[in-house]
Amino acid sequence: MLLIPAIDLKDGKCVRLKQGRMEDDTVFSEDPVAVASHWVERGARRLHLVDLNGAFAGEPVNGDIVKAIAKAHPDLPIQIGGGIRSPEIIQAYLDAGVQWVIIGTKAVNEPAFVKAMCEQFPGHIIVGLDAKDGKVATDGWANVTDVDVIDLAKQFENDGVSAIVYTDISRDGMLQGVNVDATVRLAQSMSIPVIASGGITNLDDVRNLCAVADQGISGAITGRAIYENTLDFADGQALSDELSGA
């Protein structure tokens, strides 16, 4: 199971939000490209980038930084979310060397867009689903819907997405531990990989996820924990490799 560092971009800086609130941010670095290089040096084999301004603006705002990170690490698989709302945006990111784009709110509000993008960019589309108590949330978590997250994820699997990034929003950025049960339920219901996100705090959480990784959990995104040092990234990836026999 891959441990995937999150680099959340806001106003050109690397930050973390608590539960998706733009006003509740902690700035970790003024130089996100250096942050990316740091995680690569610590053994990261994939990066998760989020354009937070883009998510709220509906179009890329920190795209130049994303492209700079991709250019600095041409062999590193990178996934980007935040403001992915048109094929032109997707094409620009893929041209810049990004491997996957993550469609979030637009996937829920306009599911046909996902199917069309999977046909246009096969193998490069991931859907990010945020859920609270099994129900899908959208618009930077401002809106919890009545849509069942498993039902929607299955629909996107049929459309051809490469993976689902699943965030339990009651736990993200709060260092409360991963909602393993909810993540496993989703992974068991589908054949494409699920990437867990939200709530990873320490090595125990890595251990707990590794114990169920064979249910279809291919990776885990970690943010606040590795920036606030409740989890040492290199130790976490080493433990994951050891437990999965990598």
UniProtKB/Swiss-Prot annotation:
Pathway: Amino-acid biosynthesis; L-histidine biosynthesis; L-histidine from 5-phospho-alpha-D-ribose 1-diphosphate: step 4/9. It comes from the Bacteria. It catalyses: 1-(5-phospho-beta-D-ribosyl)-5-[(5-phospho-beta-D-ribosylamino)methylideneamino]imidazole-4-carboxamide = 5-[(5-phospho-1-deoxy-D-ribulos-1-ylimino)methylamino]-1-(5-phospho-beta-D-ribosyl)imidazole-4-carboxamide. GO terms for cellular component: cytoplasm. It comes from Alcanivorax borkumensis (strain ATCC 700651 / DSM 11573 / NCIMB 13689 / SK2). InterPro entries: Aldolase_TIM (IPR013785), His_biosynth (IPR006062), HisA_bact_arch (IPR006063), Isoase_HisA-like (IPR044524), Isoase_HisA-like_bact (IPR023016), RibuloseP-bd_barrel (IPR011060). HAMAP family: HisA. Its main location: cytoplasm. Coiled coil: none annotated. It is an enzyme of class 5 (isomerase). GO terms for molecular function: 1-(5-phosphoribosyl)-5-[(5-phosphoribosylamino)methylideneamino]imidazole-4-carboxamide isomerase activity. It is found in: Cytoplasm. Its EC number is 5.3.1.16. Keywords: Amino-acid biosynthesis, Cytoplasm, Histidine biosynthesis, Isomerase. Belongs to the HisA/HisF family. GO terms for biological process: L-histidine biosynthetic process; L-tryptophan biosynthetic process. The active site is at D8 (proton acceptor), D130 (proton donor). This is 1-(5-phosphoribosyl)-5-[(5-phosphoribosylamino)methylideneamino] imidazole-4-carboxamide isomerase.
